[in-house]
Amino acid sequence: LLAEVKPERASEVLKIPPAEFHLPHPPPHPLERRLIFQNIGRDDYTIDLDCYVRNGGYQQLNKAISMARADIVDEVKTSGLRGRGGAGFPCGVKWSFIKPDEKKPVYLICNADESEPGTFKDRYIIHQDPHQLIEGMLISCWALNVHTAYIYIRGEFPEGAKILERAIEEARARNYLGKNILGAGFDVEIYIHRGAGAYICGEETGLIESL
């Protein structure tokens, strides 16, 4: 952190690369067990694909594509996994809305609009562990037989969008994304959609209408 920055030094500060800024994190609580944020704030962790794979990344995707889709939905139900919005809606229940034999195209949308002022729960993941988000989406796509997915990100978050775009290209280069992923005979693409900054688009139906 930079302290006592005077107006005349502002131009110097703007020249410092963002990667050189380090925000200190408090030590974890003795009873804390991080899951989603287990890689957030680590000095030895970077956002590139190689680092993610070294830390166990995409292992769960490999496991998922070896399982029957219905078994994945049942496992998610049993886990009690919930959405990270205010409602905390059970993920497995939402997945169950899709019929196993659905003939119409099904699309997956990740709501990364995060329009609540002062909320950073999504941006932490996007900026510091983007491949975790992508892997979760790919597992969801496999479980629901979805071939096209979107990440709807707020227009005011251009850096986050760029990070996700780079991560998607890395994943595609390693065959985690695109045609016949991991030799499973399954095609899936993820697209970034930048919103226009409307607050209402953080709500599910408003987001879908905007998209």
Where are these regions (language model features)?
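Feature of Fe-S/electron-transfer and energy-metabolism proteins
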Residues: L1-L211
